[in-house]
Amino acid sequence: MDNSTGTWEGCHVDSRVDHLFPPSLYIFVIGVGLPTNCLALWAAYRQVRQRNELGVYLMNLSIADLLYICTLPLWVDYFLHHDNWIHGPGSCKLFGFIFYSNIYISIAFLCCISVDRYLAVAHPLRFARLRRVKTAVAVSSVVWATELGANSAPLFHDELFRDRYNHTFCFEKFPMERWVAWMNLYRVFVGFLFPWALMLLCYRGILRAVQSSVSTERQEKVKIKRLALSLIAIVLVCFAPYHALLLSRSAVYLGRPWDCGFEERVFSAYHSSLAFTSLNCVADPILYCLVNEGARSDVAKALHNLLRFLASNKPQEMANASLTLETPLTSKRSTTGKTSGAVWAVPPTAQGDQVPLKVLLPPAQ
């Protein structure tokens, strides 16, 4: 670092090679993710009012996604200016902190949902006390405090770096610093791999419980399996490429901190993988609100009520609108959960926690 000029004589990375793809993807995420997450937040709020603990996790997930989306306009500007941050050091720290923390907050809440659904399907009676709204609120508070604290180190360091071409990088330094490399290893193993492994174990238990249920129809088993795999796929597709490159960059730096060759080769791929993490903000509400007939019906009703409200300007009509978000993975803790077109009945049993699931179709209209 040249202290007189504030210029960092680091690796030569060409910021012009990827100035179109990340901002284009971010604009797409803003356009799709903002309205869908607002709708998902309202749906989750309705779940919480019905004393459904899953709604607490969904609400926190939507809040995290919305906070992340609010930072994207500045990152669009950053990439369109060829990785040149023009909004000052304070905004760089704040928006970078929110941007990167959201990755691990989202993963943590997806993991919470996985554990909650495993307990609901595999052990509905034994762990009923853990599946309460108060417990979900406490767990959510711990998640926020833990993830924000674990990712707060950059707030106490200078995160603006000017290269030889007078570009001001925000939250990007090539090569990285040693403390950043060790923090990245923590993020990869504790923030990403551990929760994802836990999700795999939970959904393995879910699939085993569903498979052993003789009263669950084959079609419903397929739906539950598809939803289970979709949740795991969100984490894998959205976050795995980024963490693979993050791990590679950190490992190479710790082994050869003077070598810029690897940083220069993976620069474009690293930026693209980082942009792909934003697709999580689109996948979350789509997965939980649009993947099955019941949820699609509820969303259609919600949009219909919203249009009626805007057209008639009668707030009471909107207040009386009802939304119930019940799916095979979001059914309430009670012994009977309703979806559009089906009723999920869980009859009592004396066989411990092996509670069979049965779908009772309503009479034809």
Curated annotation (Swiss-Prot):
Glycosylation sites: N3, N166
Disulfide bond as UniProt keyword: yes
UniProt topological domain (Extracellular) ranges: 1-10, 83-87, 159-174, 253-262
Membrane topology: Multi-pass membrane protein
CDD domains xrefs: 7tmA_GPR4
GO terms for cellular component: plasma membrane
Cysteine pairings via disulfide bonds: C11-C260, C92-C170
Residues passing through the membrane, by range: 11-47, 52-82, 88-123, 132-158, 175-212, 217-252, 263-291
Pfam families per UniProt: 7tm_1 (PF00001)
Positions of region (Extracellular loop 2 (ECL2)): 159-174
Regulation affecting activity: Activated by a network of residues that connects an extracellular-facing cavity to Glu-147, a conserved charged residue buried in the transmembrane core of the receptor. Protonation likely drives conformational changes in extracellular loop 2 (ECL2), which stabilizes movement of transmembrane 3 (TM3) and a series of rearrangements that connect the extracellular-facing cavity to Glu-147, a residue only conserved in proton-sensing G-protein coupled receptors.
InterPro entries xrefs: GPCR_Rhodpsn, GPCR_Rhodpsn_7TM, GPR4_orph
Membrane topology, Cytoplasmic segments: 48-51, 124-131, 213-216, 292-365
Keyword Phosphoprotein: no
Subcellular localization: Cell membrane
Single Gene Ontology MF annotation: G protein-coupled receptor activity
Entry's family note: Belongs to the G-protein coupled receptor 1 family.
PANTHER family: G-PROTEIN COUPLED RECEPTOR 4, LYSOPHOSPHATIDIC ACID RECEPTOR 5/SPHINGOSYLPHOSPHORYLCHOLINE RECEPTOR
Record remark on domains: A multitude of proton-sensing residues, which include extracellular histidine residues (His-157, His-167 and His-271) or triad of buried acidic residues (Asp-65, Glu-147 and Asp-284), contribute to activation of the G-protein coupled receptor activity and pH sensitivity.
Name of the featured protein: G-protein coupled receptor 4
